[in-house]
Each structure stands twice: as structure tokens, then as C-alpha cells.
Amino acid sequence: MRPSGARRTLALAALAALALTATAAAAPPDALAEPNGGRGTSEFRGVNWADPRDNFASDEVVPSGLSTDDDYATTYDVATGILSEFRTELGANTVRLPINPWTVGTDWWESYTGAIDAATDLGMKVILSYWEADDAKDGRVDDMAAFHQMWTTVAQEYGRNRFVYAEPMNEPFGYSLEEWVDLTSQFLADHRREIPRSRVVISGTGYNDDVTGVGAAPELRGTLLSLHFYGFWADHTTEAEWLANLLPRISPYAHRTIVDEAGAPMTIGLNYGNHEGNTSTAYLGALTRVARENAMGIVYWPGLRNGDSYSLTELVGPGDLAVTSESGLAQLRWGWGLLDTEPVNDDPPAPPGAPVQGVASGRCLDVPGWSTTPGTALDLWDCNGGGNQSWDVRADGTVTVYADMCLTASGAAGSAAVIADCDSSAAQRWTLAGDGTITTATTGLCLTAAGTGNGSAVRIEPCAGTDHQRWLVG
């Protein structure tokens, strides 16, 4: 059912509340005890393993590196290789995996369980979380009957597996606190025989961005809580500002809370050892400090997702992962409690660079989606100070972004301006003139904005003296 079907009448809500009260009263004392004995959640040192499309899907969710063409045995073997890399390269002991009704109880489920089983056989904790479909994204369960059947199947298969945790829904922003407590209370009642409360992870309200409401709900006592926290939610550039942003979202429930989504750009050359002066590095410094000082677990987003600039690893071969940011990993490992000394330094937090702003539009030369894929075509976007809008004009005529990718003319007049690995070719050399034009060194064609709005393409065209071909650097 769609959102209207998920709402309960007041009468049904009252009956459900009475039933839950009776269930709680009849439960043994340890059923409502603090998870982990109130010692915190730092035992969760994890990563998300995500579908390249993101986990919002109207079909099977397939984490990067897996394939719906593979059977159980092949999926198990492929997953074992990737999960083993999470353990050895990162130090992770937890993986968060997506599920939905197109995945659970289907032909793909018969194979996908190979990934879950591979993780538990390695002694890793697994958090299974429901994502809504990409054609809904209203923060509510898409179909309550399908949702219930999905979790019933999961509970029957993994409810008694001590390594597997159930997170009823990812980012339930479509529900009020009262509605969300009602839904998750019913979830606990429905699956109380298979899944103990101590292995149920209740998402915070909104975009999982605040756990104080669910933490205070007596109906949810004994459960774990999940928080999401991202650096693109604000523009703070100091660790102190991020601490002030984060702490009110948690207090006083840190001992029950896992930050099961948190991430920052890992493929653009940032130095996470310096926490001042850059939004992303200050954010990660604050997050890891709060986690370490409050014995909170972090499940990084994502450990692996093809094409995601936040991905902490990339696939470089079958079962072989490469770390994308050593400084980012070191800061995360410190937050996990795996390092004795925080890996800080005084080097600049970001590569050198400045915005390149179109005179006609007032918007900035932008790498869409923070992509690091060679051949990505550039466009215009509102200036935001991000690393994907920070360009370094070098003495050799190259213009770099992320420290090691170059502005490149992809072809003749009318072709796109793209990013590519720097290779010293003529297509990557530019001349910045006093009139604001940026021209290719060999052909004399001008860097040109096709329009003035967000998303306008940037191409190389014959110079015509228009403001669409004039740029302000810095």
C-alpha cells in the first residue's frame, strides 16, 4: 500500500498500544534491558555495501561487485572476497546491507543470502535495512503487506542468528515521531519470537538524523538506535561547529546509538588529518571524536559503491579492493578505537584551487556529483565552495581539480569540456587571457557555457566575445 494505507486509525493505534503494553508486561526482564548492557555500541566497526544505483530501487538491490546472474555459491565466493577485504584493509567487523520486497523471498534472495552467510561465517555483524523504492521516496513504507512478508521471511531465516540485526526502515522521514514509534512497536511485537530487541536497530526520525525521540519512547526500550549524519548538511568549517551540530541529535542516548550512515568525499584528495578550514575534514573529525568519546559504533557510507566519490574502497580486481583515502581511513579507524593516537597533521586540508565563475551566469564550473570518472562532462552549478568546484591553474597551463585530474577538451568545436587523468597532452593545456576567456592552447577555442542555469553544459566553441565565454577565477 501507498502512504495512506500505512496510516492507522486512532482506534487501531489504541488497540496496538494496549497489545504492546501487555506484551511488554509479560516479557522477561532481560527482554527490555539496555542493549550491550549499556556499554555502548563501539563493537560495530562497519561499512555500508551499496548498490551502484544507490539502494533505492524498484527491483532487486545488488551491492557493487555482485550480480543477479550468479547463484548462491558464486555469490558466496564473491562476497567472501570483498568482505575479507573490508576486514583486512579497513578493520571492519560489520556490514550494512540493503533489502526490499523485490530482493527477499525471490530468486535473487536465494543467491543474495550467500552474501549474508559469507559475512556471518567470517564472524561479521550484518545489519539488514529496508530501503523504499526509487519511484516513491516519500519516507514511508511502500506496501505494508509486502513489508511485513519481507521481514517475516528475514526473521524466519536469520532471526536466531546472533550476527544478524534488523533495521526496519532506512530514513523514515515521511512519518511523525508518533507514527514511527507506532510502526516500529508493531514490528517488535510481530517478530518478538524470532528477533530479540537487542538486535533490532530503530532509525532516528527524519532522515535518521535525530535519535532523541525514539530513544525516549518507552515502547522501544531495549533496542539499538541508528543515526545518519553527513557533512553536506551544513557548511561548518571547524570541528567545534560540527560538534555543536551533532551532539544534540544524540544526547542522552549515545550508549544505544550506532551511526550507521556517515561519509565524506574520499576520492578528491582531501587531507582528513587537518580538521580546520574545510567542511568535510572538520565534519569527519567531529564525528569520529564523538563516536570515540561516547563508545559509539560507526558504519561508514559507503565502504564500497561503484561510482560514489564517498566510497572508502574501489574494486580493482576480483575480490580485491583498494583504499581511496589513507587519511580518511586513518581518521575512521581512530574513531573506531583501533588507533591509540589521533592521526592529525598540519598539512592543508584540501588541494589548492579556487572557483571558476561564469560571468553570464554567476554560477561555477562544476564536476557533477563529485564524479572522479574520466570523461565526466562539466556543467554550471550554484557556487558552493566544494572540492568539485575548486580549480588550480598551474604554471604549465593545466587546470586541475582534486589535485590529480585535469580540465580537458574532449574534441573539436562543440565538444564537451571534461575531466580526465592528467597526462600532459595538448588537450589539457589552457590559456587564461586578461579578458576572462579560457582558451585551449592548441586550437584557440573558448571554454563556453551553453546557458546560465544549473546543469548548463560547458563546451569548447569558437570565441565570440560573449559573456558566456568569460570567467572569473578565484
Where do the PLM segments sit?
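Lectin-like carbohydrate-binding module/patch detector with strong preference for beta-trefoil
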Residues: P348-G474
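Extracellular glycoside hydrolase catalytic/binding regions
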Residues: E60-Y76, M144-T152, Q156, R160-Y165, ...
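Short, solvent-exposed loop/turn segments at secondary-structure junctions
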Residues: T103-G105, D134-K137, Y175, M266-G269
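Low-complexity, Pro/Thr/Ser/Gly/Ala-rich linker/spacer regions in secreted
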Residues: P29-G38, G337-V356, N454, G474
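Secretory targeting and sorting signals
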Residues: M1-A33
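Aromatic-lined substrate-binding rim segments of carbohydrate-active enzymes
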Residues: A79-D134, M144-F147, H191-E194, Y283-N294
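N-terminal carbohydrate-binding accessory modules
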Residues: T9, A27-T94
